[in-house]
């Protein structure tokens, strides 16, 4: 499976035969604002995931060594996610694990880097490393890309409001 798509400013690269994928997205906001939107639970729940999803935080300790957990709900049910923040470098980098409670044996590692593009713009580059090629391909097939696109569009609107 080789996928390299650009939907609504999200670039998703899914290299064939690897356990990883790359996501790149530019935002019209400074790195500190994009970082805060990822670390502040009150902001995170407003933009994370597809349009029809609502999120509830169960645990949120946004620091190196801290844990996080939330539940996403839609008309079809609820979906729990959890992980640990392995590295939090303010306005620069977030390294965390990510586990969907429906597949507890499939732990992913996410590495997010924020790059200041100047003029109040930020590039968010994210690498997600899955436990297997099959897990990665399953997440992509389940609609991961549309969730990312819709979530980042909601984040754009939130940042435009001054968050």
Regions found by a protein language model. Give the residues of each.
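Hydrophobic/aromatic beta-strand elements that line small-molecule binding cavities or substrate pockets
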Residues: 24-25, 57-60, 81-87, 98, ...
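Short beta-edge strand/loop motif at the mouth of beta-sheet-based domains
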Residues: 22-23, 42-78
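Intrinsic-disorder/low-complexity, polar/charged segments enriched in Ser/Thr/Lys/Arg/Asp/Glu/Gln
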Residues: 18-24, 55, 67, 80, ...
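Hydrophobic pocket/interface hotspot
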Residues: 34-35, 44, 68, 85, ...
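Beta-strand/loop substructures that line and gate deep hydrophobic ligand-binding cavities in soluble
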Residues: 20, 95-149
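A short, structured loop/turn motif at beta-sheet edges
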Residues: 31-32, 63, 86-92, 114-123
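Hydrophobic ligand-binding cavity/cleft-lining segments
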Residues: 1-54
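A conserved amphipathic terminal alpha-helix motif
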Residues: 1-6, 87, 130-163
């Amino acid at each position: 499976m080789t996928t390299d798509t650009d939907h609504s400013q999200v670039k998703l690269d899914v290299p064939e035969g690897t356990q990883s994928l790359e996501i790149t997205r530019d935002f019209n906001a400074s790195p500190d604002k994009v970082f805060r939107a990822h670390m502040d639970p009150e902001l995170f729940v407003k933009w994370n995931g597809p349009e029809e999803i609502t999120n509830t935080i169960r645990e949120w300790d946004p620091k190196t060594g801290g844990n996080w957990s939330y539940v996403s709900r839609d008309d079809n049910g609820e979906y729990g996610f959890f992980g640990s923040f392995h590295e939090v470098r303010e306005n620069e980098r977030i390294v965390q694990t990510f586990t969907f409670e429906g597949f507890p044996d499939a732990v992913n590692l996410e590495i997010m880097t924020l790059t200041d593009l100047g003029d109040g713009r930020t590039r968010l580059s994210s690498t997600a490393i899955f436990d297997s090629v099959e897990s990665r391909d399953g997440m992509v097939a389940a609609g991961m890309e549309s969730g990312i696109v819709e979530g980042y569009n909601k984040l754009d609107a939130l940042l435009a409001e001054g968050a």
